Amino acid sequence: MLPQEVENILDVVIRHNTWRRKETINLIASENVMSPLAELVYINDLAGRYAEGIVGSRYYQGVRYVDILEDALSKKFANVLGARFVDVRPISGTIANLAAYFALVPEGGTVASLPIKYGGHISHNTVGGLKALRLKAVELPWDLENFNIDVDAARKLIEEKRPNLIILGASLYLFPHPVKEIAEVAKTVGAYVLHDSAHVFGLIVGGAFPNPLREGAHLTTASTHKTFPGPQGGVIATVLDEEKNSQIQRAVFPTFTSNYHLHRYAATYVTLVEMEVFGREYATRIVENARALAEALAAEGVPPVAERQGYTKTHQVAVDVSKFGGGDKVAALLEEANIIVNKNALPWDKSVLKPSGIRIGVQEMTRFGMGKDEMREIARFIARVLRGEDVNNIKRDVVEFRKSYLEIKYGFKISRDIVDKIFHSLNLYT
């Protein structure tokens, strides 16, 4: 028998699995689920191993298979993205960003980026990694009418402030940023352009969003677990020269990481192949579903932002819920009905700590096979909550609704033979 405290922890895990995997409508824009095969191969001996260094030059022995996995994954990403260099060792998108900043921006240098209220990620701002690296930040100007970077004002800012690095991409990201236009002015001041593709990485790989490396960015960073539905991890892809790529490598290790969470490599590779096979359909459906959900919410009297632009061209929908009590209140109320979203600041908010909005992402529910009709049903659930209907009644309806959407699509299945091979290799069968 297991100790009771262990049984208690196992029970928590099982209850969480059941709740989030089977009973909730998961609309967090930064999350997703792996395919059955990717989730299975995520369980491997590499979870407890180290491989400091780079392929072919390690500080540890016993890494022959690590080198095969890391080399294969890096080369495959490079081929898919059209990159000269890829580093898959960062353990998150934020670590990938920090390594890029450290390699490309001198101490005391300047970074131009979007503030949080305009969608910028914490790692793009002095509240996050920029402060730790003693870098200065200047805010890219925002065009509220077009819900995007103000190109003309940004051009003037870049020419005046002459930043070392310009960060595009965002945490709240509804429309592609003007990479080409910013890259052109960056060239005149010698600035690097980094596109943080964390949120839209799967859309890029699936061809539903512009590839920033082909639009003029010098490098892109990403996480591998949002619209790209793999395990949590990070990646850096560049079109830079060998010297700069080597600086990035040295920033990843030994500066910011020692262990690269090697057990994710195989699952990430499986996911990348899945995106080659299913990604175009999956990415297209994600964008279609986001637009359908936005239109349905508007019809229900819960209007998303950016109506003039068609609401969204990504997986995200942003809704101003100030008239319903604000982002904090609405996100908590929706969770009571088993609808999971996050509060989010909007450009007109005076404080990001008291946001007027919520952010919604459809990538996970799309992977469970939902389409436009289901998006309209989700909009009705959300509207019912905001109109004050008993959340317990809505919760029961949500749980019943999810029963029809439990199978993960756009990925590889598993067989008993594969399960046996993995478990026997780990000696998990007794």
UniProtKB/Swiss-Prot annotation:
Modified residues (N6-(pyridoxal phosphate)lysine): K226
Residues given in the record as (6S)-5,6,7,8-tetrahydrofolate binding sites: G120, H121, I122
Main localization (coarse): cytoplasm
Superkingdom as given in the UniProt entry: Archaea
Entry EC no(s): 2.1.2.-
Cellular localisation: Cytoplasm
Pathway(s) annotated for this protein in UniProt: Amino-acid biosynthesis; glycine biosynthesis; glycine from L-serine: step 1/1
One GO process term, biological-process aspect: glycine biosynthetic process from serine
Cofactor(s) named in the record: pyridoxal 5'-phosphate
Pfam families: SHMT
Site (described: Plays an important role in substrate specificity): H225
Record's subunit section: Homodimer.
Biological role: Catalyzes the reversible interconversion of serine and glycine with a modified folate serving as the one-carbon carrier. Also exhibits a pteridine-independent aldolase activity toward beta-hydroxyamino acids, producing glycine and aldehydes, via a retro-aldol mechanism.
Similarity section: Belongs to the SHMT family.
Name used for this protein in its record: Serine hydroxymethyltransferase
Annotated source species: Pyrobaculum islandicum (strain DSM 4184 / JCM 9189 / GEO3)
Classification of source organism: Archaea, Thermoproteota, Thermoprotei, Thermoproteales, Thermoproteaceae
Gene responsible for this protein: glyA
